[in-house]
Amino acid sequence: MKTKIFCDIAELNLIKKFNKKKIVKGFTTNPSLMRKAGAKDYRSYSKKILSICNNKPVSLEVFADDYVNMKKQAMQINTWAKNVYVKVPIANSKGEFMGRIIKELNSQNIKLNITAIYSAKQTEKILKLINKKT
């Protein structure tokens, strides 16, 4: 197995610093980290991150909690850059499994980072839904 290091940060100065490190293979963030870093507009802040890391994968998380808005956000995020991965939680804040959206986005060849997985059972559910070649 080959280990890859991804930084889970949102501060632009730290992203610039760690983007120069060969050991760092990509970045992941979420709306909470971005707010703490001073982001006022999710899209414009995300695009700043993507422009800094244009040669490494960057996972940007949807912040909607329902299927319709989550899909809308995922489709938008997917258009922002070639190196973007759409980060989708395995369950929403009500504990509802987000399998439907994960399956749909995966079937459209949208690169996904499925987050907040806490058990082998959750992993098994995802593996039954996705095309493992994507």
Placement of each model-derived feature along the sequence:
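Active-site beta->alpha loop and helix N-cap motifs at the rims of alpha/beta catalytic domains
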Residues: 2-3, 9-16, 21-24, 28-111
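Catalytic alpha/beta core domains of metabolic enzymes, predominantly
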Residues: 110-134
